Amino acid sequence: MQVSYFHVAADVPDAIGSVEGPDAAVVIDVLRATTTIAWALHNGAEAVQAFADLDELRLQSRNWPEQTRLLLGERGGRMLEGFDLGNSPVAVIPEVVQGKRLFMSTTNGTRALQRVRDVSVVMTVALPNRQAVAQRLLRDQPERVWMVGSGWEGTYSLEDSLAAGALADALVAAGAQVANDELQAALALWAQWKHDPEACLRVASHGQRLTRLGNHDADFSCCAGLDQLSVVPTQTEPGVLRAIRV
């Protein structure tokens, strides 16, 4: 297994669907989209449908019964007007999301998902489901895995690289090969912060941005919780993620 990491969607090569392209893609948005997706599916959401475009989200959501849908979204870390929830993993509790389709759009994570949606296998990872995703990849043994960070508005993010390093650490320990310098750097970052990942999230520029917006202590704690979930959010149709458990 050859594993590469790309900091943001714009860095992903135009090789998807070609013989040089990935056999599996893993999207990362630690603060907070892929953490929220993992917890929502763990807590019984029917699926999470991701949109980069808000107009498309609103249009598609109208085709779903109102009592079985929720709109989740943020821009700049703030909940969108008219939406049911923002992008907090601690808000997607079972009594809120059980059995519902979540229509989701965020500043960064949903763009990264759209970039790789044509890869044959698409998953999402965050720190809480790091080991579950590693186990799935090690079981299936795709030849080429591309991890894709979401970043912040097209720029590098510390926390996504931390999670890339965390996932790579588990894969490399089982024989996977590091295929680019970006992943090698992410491994070094994980080695530095693995004993206190929450501290890394808080010093990251997006972590500081969330702190300025208000008290997000519960979100930081949730997003930093390592290996707590057995769910692997997996694309089952374009843009739609469902729970696969390992």
UniProtKB/Swiss-Prot annotation:
Keyword line: Hydrolase, Magnesium
Gene3D superfamilies tied to this protein: ComB-like (3.90.1560.10)
InterPro entries in the cross-refs: ComB-like (IPR005238), ComB-like_sf (IPR036702)
Cofactor field: Mg(2+)
Catalytic activity entry: (2R)-O-phospho-3-sulfolactate + H2O = (2R)-3-sulfolactate + phosphate
Enzyme Commission number, as recorded: 3.1.3.71
Superkingdom of source: Bacteria
An annotated Gene Ontology molecular function: sulfopyruvate decarboxylase activity
Enzyme class at the top of the EC tree: hydrolase
Pfam family, one: 2-ph_phosp
Similarity section: Belongs to the ComB family.
Alphabetical list of HAMAP family matching this protein: ComB (MF_00490)
NCBIfam families: PRK00886.1-2
Protein name from the UniProt record: Probable 2-phosphosulfolactate phosphatase
Taxonomic lineage: Bacteria, Bacillati, Cyanobacteriota, Cyanophyceae, Synechococcales
